[in-house]
Curated annotation (Swiss-Prot):
Keywords: 4Fe-4S, Iron, Iron-sulfur, Metal-binding, Methyltransferase, S-adenosyl-L-methionine, Transferase. Belongs to the class I-like SAM-binding methyltransferase superfamily. RNA M5U methyltransferase family. The keyword Transcription does not apply. This is Uncharacterized RNA methyltransferase SAV_2389. The lineage of its organism: Bacteria, Bacillati, Actinomycetota, Actinomycetes, Kitasatosporales.
Length: 433
């Protein structure tokens, strides 16, 4: 490590870096660079003879027109690993994400953007269209790491080392106003700060180091306090509520500590709108909400299916299932089952459905689950994905099972990072013949 190469930067790759080659043909994955630039790249990971090396652009010799000075003082080689594209204009960030989606669709599913019903654009979330130079403060949940001196900060890229910070520019106002960075967190491994979008609820989750005592938490705003137990890794209440209240599509959702909710304040509404516009639910439909979390899409479906419609949600997390059942208790024809999708589905006895929504974790649904879904003959399927590679792979499985992507929409719900959210709508291929 530490070797330096002067290289021409090639295309963007999945993961927040660009591809380059040394004069000897060695592949470099280079962070802090942009396509078309000439940079001095310093190797940060990998050994001679490896299939590829990781590197940072430590000097820009010929800059792209899309380059800007990173607004965050903690961005750059060897610094905070939270953001990937601080050095790129917002429009360029979205274009790069679109190029990654297109490459993954072609490589893993054999689909062009046109064949996927996608116009190639990545849309910003509402409220993120800001004047030049302004950074969207969107992250409603920030996991701060704590260094040996008790300073809160963020992890450096692919490292356990902590970059102490005074302020995270992409943290939502509700997180920033807690003043996490101003406190001494000695004895803590991490401090997870959550600011709900649909209420004034605030929560911090403290993870103590082995044998450490919990500090007295005095923050700038009222806050619930939870702790991660050393023995079982479970999250337990110390003070206040054990949940926050979020709001989307006109409905309030209880989200327990450790539960999943989209971190961009507009993400839940954006995704519900895209899914419902794609599915066009009808009164009386039977629908599945898979990997349903606290019931976001199940609630949206139930509101639209009427008294004769029905929704089955499946979720593996015990606390998320409890929250989903609480959130949707008013609907007699909504049922939430706990377990892995591929295990629970066969036990339900369901042989056909009208609509399916799946929002799997980053690894995607996988071949076995896709085959199960195809057998149900749904009129439409909405696939919500946070990883273009897993999405593309699974779309290939759906194609093999007789389904075709009718539309695909991409949303920049993680500005400054390489992450992107997609919603694909599928229908039986025979429908288009």
């Amino acid at each position: 490590m530490g070797e330096e190469y002067e290289v021409e930067i090639g295309p963007v790759a999945h993961g927040g870096h660009c591809i380059a080659r040394t004069s000897e043909g060695q592949v470099l994955f280079v962070r802090h660079a942009l396509p078309g630039e000439r940079v001095l790249a310093r190797v940060t990971e990998g050994e001679e003879g490896a299939r590829y090396l990781r590197a940072d652009a430590v000097e820009i010799l010929d800059a792209s027109k899309d380059r800007v000075e990173a607004p965050c003082p903690y961005a750059g080689p060897g610094r905070c690993g939270g953001c990937d594209w601080q050095h790129a204009k917002p429009g360029a960030q979205r274009r790069l994400k679109g190029e990654v989606i297109a490459e993954q669709l072609q490589r893993l599913a054999g689909l062009t953007p046109e064949e996927a019903g996608w116009d190639g654009t990545v849309m910003p979330a509402e409220g993120d269209k800001l004047p030049a130079g302004e950074v969207p403060a969107w992250r409603t949940r920030v996991q701060y790491a704590v260094d040996a001196d008790g300073n809160a900060g963020l992890r450096r890229h692919r490292s356990h080392e902590v970059e102490p910070i005074e302020h995270c520019m992409i943290a939502a106002p509700g997180v920033s106003e807690l003043g996490i960075e101003e406190r001494d967190w000695s004895g803590m491994e991490s401090v997870d700060a959550i600011a709900a979008t649909g209420s004034q609820d605030r929560m911090v989750i403290l993870e103590p180091r082995p044998g450490a005592r919990l500090p007295l938490v005095e923050l700038d705003k009222p806050v619930s306090v939870m702790r991660v137990e050393e023995k079982d890794g479970g999250i337990h209440r110390v003070h206040g509520r054990a949940f926050v209240r979020e709001r989307a599509d006109g409905r309030t959702y209880r989200v327990g500590s450790g539960g999943f909710w989209q971190v961009h304040p507009m993400a839940a509404d954006t995704l519900v709108k895209a899914v419902m516009q794609g599915l066009l639910p009808r009164k009386g439909d039977m629908a599945l909400d898979l990997y349903c979390g606290v019931g976001l899409f199940a609630g949206a479906l139930a509101d639209r299916l009427g008294d004769k419609g029905a929704v089955l949600g499946i979720e593996s997390g015990k606390r998320a299932v409890e929250d989903a059942r609480h959130n949707l208790a008013a609907f007699e024809r909504v049922r939430i089952e706990q377990g892995k999708v591929e295990a629970v589905l066969p036990r339900t006895g369901i042989t056909e459905v009208d609509l399916i929504v799946l929002d799997p974790p980053r690894a995607g649904a996988g071949k076995k689950t896709v085959e199960q879904l195809v057998s149900l003959g749904a009129r439409k399927i909405a696939y919500v994905a946070c990883d273009p590679a897993a999405l593309a792979r699974d779309l290939g499985y759906f194609r093999d099972g007789g389904y075709k992507v009718r539309t695909l929409r991409a949303f920049d719900l993680f500005p400054m990072t390489h992450h992107v959210e997609c919603v694909a709508i599928l229908e039986p291929a025979a429908k288009g013949l």
